[in-house]
A protein has these predicted regions:
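An alpha-helical, amphipathic repeat domain used for nucleic-acid recognition
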Residues: 1-169
């Protein structure tokens, strides 16, 4: 008897799912419930689901007023998430792509000074390569790796020099 009741419940659920698509607000809250979004990112995600740009901007303004949407909070979360794997330049570029203002970007990156960046680059290089470069080809490979991760050439060369003299930086 219980199996039949479950079967009937399953049969009615597809009809219920087709009844009404989620509202714009529901979509926004579902996305924001998963992770932080910048205003520009959330707008681009929601734009295909609305006919009226005014409705979308009104919703985004309301979410920002209520504290559900914050570029500052998004920037801080992104920096926290990426600071151990990427340099300041790469993180700043990602924030710029996400539409975060220069002021919010600068505020979020204040904790990443040159020494912090040096130590994270050192740790990253040790995890990836384990040994200092033995020839020019290997050195170029390690330089490219750190450059692709957003570290400046100055930091990269300091890290390589330190890894040769003291393998544990």
């Amino acid at each position: 008897m219980q199996a039949r009741a479950q079967g009937q419940a399953r049969a009615s659920s597809p009809a219920r799912a087709q009844a009404q698509p989620p509202s714009l607000r529901g979509r926004a809250l579902r996305l924001l419930g998963r992770r932080e979004f910048s205003r520009a990112e959330l707008e681009s995600r929601l734009r295909p689901h609305t006919e009226s740009p005014e409705e979308l901007h009104a919703l985004l303004d309301e979410l920002a007023e209520r504290g559900g949407l914050s570029d500052t909070r998004f920037a801080e979360a992104l920096v926290r998430q990426r600071k151990d794997r990427y340099g300041k330049r790469a993180i700043a570029q990602r924030l710029k792509q996400a539409g975060v203002s220069a002021e919010d970007t600068a505020a979020a990156l204040t904790g990443m000074d040159a020494d912090t960046e040096f130590h994270t680059a050192c740790a990253l290089l040790q995890r990836k390569f384990r040994h200092p470069p033995t020839d020019d080809k290997e050195k170029a490979r390690q330089v490219r790796f750190l450059q692709a991760r957003g570290y400046t050439i100055g930091t990269t060369l300091r890290v390589l020099k330190a890894s040769v003299t003291a393998p544990d930086c």
